[in-house]
Amino acid sequence: MKWGLATAGLPIVAHSLTASGEGISTAAKNSEPGGSIVALPSGAQVFYREDWLGAPWLDGEPVLFLHGNLETSEVWYGWVPRMAQRFRLYRPDLPGFGRSKVPANFEWSLANYTKTAADFLDAVGVASAHIIGAKTGGAIAMQFAATYPQRTRTLVVASGPFSSVDPKTENTSQQVRLGSAATKEEMAYFDKLRDATSPETRRGIGGIISTINLDNLLPKITARTLIITSDRSALQSVETVLRYQPKIPNSRLLVLTSDAYHVAVANADECVTNVLGFIQDAKMPG
């Protein structure tokens, strides 16, 4: 069961340089088990996974996934089987997470992560993409869409914060993050991802999320936007989301029936169904 809200807050029924958006990359790519690594101008080394399950003679429209705090690009596993049949997926480990490295002088700011996302698209030869972000990655995605409107085909934000978040939320139990349906094995896996996050990254990201303020940027987002949250999110209430979402032109809100706040994982299949429909609708004129 789910319900959605249009821009004005009224209930609704939930539902490049080349043709594919590819540019020409001049960045050196190094193959890694399970993916590749590209070097960005900032000095960051970004590991990423590229997924395409469509016909080999076709080239799907690009989608850029931006994960949240205390995790890696692996968390999009529930999105890949269906999304990659229609889109070419780029799933980077954000700098400081997983197999991606930050340079010694890395600037821990939302603006720098936004620039990093743009530099990554340059490195893989993508001029524009559908941008999908979860949790802190959702905040990066919103700032990206406001900063690079010409590079944003559509925007999807799954449980992304619009304003500051207490860094202590990193100590929240996986049961709260993933919901009551999460298994012990699933929670143990996410504990492992959390524990693998370096103290430097935790401090840096903690400083970012404690100062998030997207209020003035939201009206600058011109891409069609889908905001996804849950009706019992411990991260932010539906009422909180409703104070911000209508400020994004051409946006809609989808509220899922769930007690998890990491809906991109806990409600992955439902998210994918709605995102596929949303992107299809966004391509329609009007």
Give, region by region, the residue ranges found by the protein language model:
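Hydrophobic, aromatic-rich cap/lid helix
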Residues: Y189-N216, R232
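Conserved hydrolase catalytic core segment
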Residues: A127-D166
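Active-site loop/oxyanion-hole signature of alpha/beta-hydrolase fold enzymes
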Residues: R49-W52, P81, Y90-I132, T273
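Short beta-strand/loop motif that positions the catalytic acidic residue
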Residues: I221, I227-T229
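Conserved alpha/beta-hydrolase "acid-adjacent" motif
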Residues: A234-T240
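Catalytic active-site module of serine/aspartate enzymes centered on a nucleophile-bearing elbow/loop
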Residues: S251-G286
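N-terminal export signals
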Residues: M1-A19
